[in-house]
Amino acid sequence: MLQPKRTKFRKVHKGRNTGLAQRGNKVSFGEFGLKATGRGRITARQIEAARRTMTRRIKRGGKIWIRIFPDKPITKKPLEVRMGKGKGPVEYWVAEIEPGRMLYEMEGVSEELAREAFTLAAAKLPVATTFVTRTVM
């Protein structure tokens, strides 16, 4: 599963997820992309589940790029522990997703197959997504 090798701080504040994606919002590597239209958090497990689904669907052909990385630690206190006594240990890692963010990219497959694979992957993700193709400038 994806997570940072090392971080400056072990735990972070909750923060707020606002605004639109200013970076990582175009198809940069492949021909087709899965773009977020909603806002939310995607865990490392969800990123991996969607990747495995796409890989199974396209079989040997094509290449997949993961354009997001879970770099925010989410903490959780153990069950039946009283309030206070500090922040709990890190439970899992998430990527904060803003509308417009490119989640995955793919090339080397037909548009029909890419669309199918992204539809299957989107079912594993907690944010609304859309299929996009590369626009040549």
From Swiss-Prot:
Alphabetical keyword list: Ribonucleoprotein, Ribosomal protein, RNA-binding, rRNA-binding, tRNA-binding
One GO term describing the cellular component: cytosolic large ribosomal subunit
Description of how the protein assembles with itself and partners: Part of the 50S ribosomal subunit.
InterPro entries noted in UniProt: Ribosomal_uL16, Ribosomal_uL16_bact-type, Ribosomal_uL16_CS, Ribosomal_uL16_dom, Ribosomal_uL16_sf
BP-aspect Gene Ontology terms: translation
HAMAP family: Ribosomal_uL16
Gene: rplP
A Pfam match: Ribosomal_L16
Gene Ontology molecular function terms on file: rRNA binding; structural constituent of ribosome; tRNA binding
Stated role: Binds 23S rRNA and is also seen to make contacts with the A and possibly P site tRNAs.
UniProt protein name: Large ribosomal subunit protein uL16
